Amino acid sequence: MAPSSKRKAINDDFITTISDNEADEFVEEEEVIQEEAPPKKKSKTIPKKKQKRSSKKASNDDDAEDEEDGHIEGVWGQNDDDDGAMDSDFEFVTGAGVEDLDDNPEFEGWGFDGAKKAMGQGNGVDLDEIIRRRREKKEGGTKGAAEPEAKAEEEGEALGLDDDDDEVLARDAFGMGAGSDDEDSAEASEGQDGSEASEGEEGDSDDESVASPVPHPDDDQESESEQDEDEEEAAKMKEFFAADEPKSDTNKGNASFQSMSLSRPILRGLTSVGFAKPTPIQSKTIPIALMGKDVVGGAVTGSGKTAAFVVPILERLLYRPKKVPTSRVVILAPTRELAIQCHAVATKLASHTDIKFCLAVGGLSLKVQESELRLRPDVIIATPGRFIDHMRNSASFAVDTVEILVLDEADRMLEDGFADELNEILTTLPKSRQTMLFSATMTSSVDNLIRVGLNKPVRLMVDSQKKTVVTLTQEFVRLRPGREEKRMGYLVYLCKNLYTERVIIFFRQKKIAHHARIIFGLLGLSCAELHGSMSQIQRIQSVEAFRDGKVSFLLATDLASRGLDIKGVDTVINYEAPQSLEIYVHRVGRTARAGRSGTAITLAAEPDRKVVKAAVKAGKAQGAKISSRIIDAADADSWQAKIDELEDEVEAVMREEKEEKVLAQADMEMRKGENMIRYEDDIKARPKRTWFETEKDKKAAREAGRAALNGVREALKKKHGGKNLSNKDKKKLDAMAEAKEARVWKKGAAERAGKGAVLNFKKDKSSKKGPVVGGRVAKKGAPRGKPRRR
């Protein structure tokens, strides 16, 4: 070969001496070695005869040959034997090696590399390009109209209503009445004194209005379910869950991963991602999961729940039989982004092992996933729908060998929207499996957990349910009645003046999120959107753009509220309060993760009172930082006026976007028709893909999930043609819900003590008969005769 011939020309033809030009010759030899290094595999296979001949040479000749080959094999060299001595350069690592995740220069957050190889090439409509063209066109046509616009803005500010009283009244904290009974009674007494002192005076000052807050009637009501503990449910839980093990010093000793007897490849993987010490949920879960027990785990957001179930899975898979490749683990997640992130976490933790992973989520190439599943990877991370698709339609893919099932964000997976898909998966997987469930708002309802097929699970609740982290500051901006329509003005004011970097804004609806995306673009705010109407490529691009700092705002629906771990998120803004406290906990959990600090702001109007009250009450119980932020009404009105002026531009952008989507759809249909003609025989030869539900059943499941999330309001809104409900309709619905809850009978204190049930029954019978007159029960209708005189 060429390198060897060059070496012969240097070493054999001419032997240099000290007096010769040694520098030039040495440089030439280095250049030869750097040009083409010999492969390592060649130096490993050395014939025995050659070894015997080489043993007769001097040791300095052996060293020279090793240097010529370009490397030294092993600790003791290529041809040396292991004499049992320890390498002098070896160092013991007693700690994890990395004190903090931020101090590790190699780790830059979880990426989407596992999904990119199965992604297509289409990018969809470039909304930024459309907005850029519209802005350039507008700026070019309105150069001479600067002065009239300035005058119009001054007139608009002069005509604006001064709502300072409303904003000062925000100090009553809109939901702060959710404290203890003593605080409520004290506030009520103060309110009565203030009202008596100011009776007959219409023009109270701002200070007086702050000093005498009037609590809302709904804030004083406490449901009977919160006051009385349901012992029947407690008995069910005691029978269903495994008995609590006595606390020992072993858990206290788990101050490091080394004390858990984990293998060295796993410890190296933990060090590479910056995990120095196990979190409480990890220190509790890993030893129990290694025993093969079922686990129901819950902890606050950002506490490392993914690593809590991935680490014991990897440790167990290190000792698997390796002769026949077998899929042994299935991890299910409710959203594609969460599954992709879980795949990234597991891949990095297993970077020093031979464990194989497969990502099977919707929106990515089926063929790529089928080819990976054909190799039978050890761990399959998937969403329920795509997993069922492969389970029914992919050849050479079987789930008979699955030994471990993990449900990430299990409370969401147990809701009505996933009920049918989850039942299909659970009935197909083997019964003798280990099952682990994790969530920040983990349910304790035994009736829901029974469906999963758990076998005496161990309940590991590190934190109380529906709890936020201590480092999170929660702020609420109250929108007084009549100002809900100016919500977008408040949002733009916050993003322009207060929170300008690394902000996630949550919306309830995809339509509003997309509308806000266009407004932000026209106002010059760099942003990206994330919701279900986008293609998977666009969704990944949006998350990566926000993660890399290319955009400052991520406008998302609740698609991004669960599990998404983006490094450095400083602020979360709720455009409106979510439907429940559980969703609120997951939303605000996108910031203040892994011990960092963060801020969550909620724009709350009157319909959001119920959720805000629950959030404030939960925050007060744990001592969280809760405050009310006051925004000047004039500032919000000025931004809302600018937004109203952009309505024509917004409609024009949406119209142009729709036209480009139609053109892209037509182009795709044309290519599809060409492929149908060109590959007709191959397409017809493919087996038809099947599903376990009909279209009618799928639609019913979607409606059930939507109804469980939004309640009766969604159905009533459809009845009114999709229009927003009036306050009157909303009050009717709330009254119906309260009446429905009141009809549900629960045991009281007397019934649990064995008393009161018969008495209550007698009272009900006597009340039905009528009032008692003269010691007798009067019958219904007109009384017969006069009562007896005494």
Curated annotation (Swiss-Prot):
Its EC number is 3.6.4.13. Residues 286-460 form the Helicase ATP-binding domain. GO terms for cellular component: cytosol; nucleolus. One of its GO terms (molecular function) is ATP binding. It comes from the Eukaryota. InterPro entries: DEAD/DEAH_box_helicase_dom, DEAD_box_RNA_helicase, Helicase_ATP-bd, Helicase_C-like, P-loop_NTPase, RNA-helicase_DEAD-box_CS, RNA_helicase_DEAD_Q_motif. Residues 40-56, 777-790 have a biased composition (Basic residues). It holds the Pfam family Helicase_C. Residues 137-153 have a biased composition (Basic and acidic residues). A motif (DEAD box) lies at residues 408-411. A motif (Q motif) lies at residues 255-283. Residues 631-677 form a coiled coil. It catalyses: ATP + H2O = ADP + phosphate + H(+). Keywords: ATP-binding, Coiled coil, Helicase, Hydrolase, Nucleotide-binding, Nucleus, Ribosome biogenesis, RNA-binding. The Q motif is unique to and characteristic of the DEAD box family of RNA helicases and controls ATP binding and hydrolysis. Belongs to the DEAD box helicase family. DDX27/DRS1 subfamily. ATP-binding RNA helicase involved in ribosome assembly. Associates with pre-ribosomal particles. This is ATP-dependent RNA helicase DRS1. The gene is DRS1.
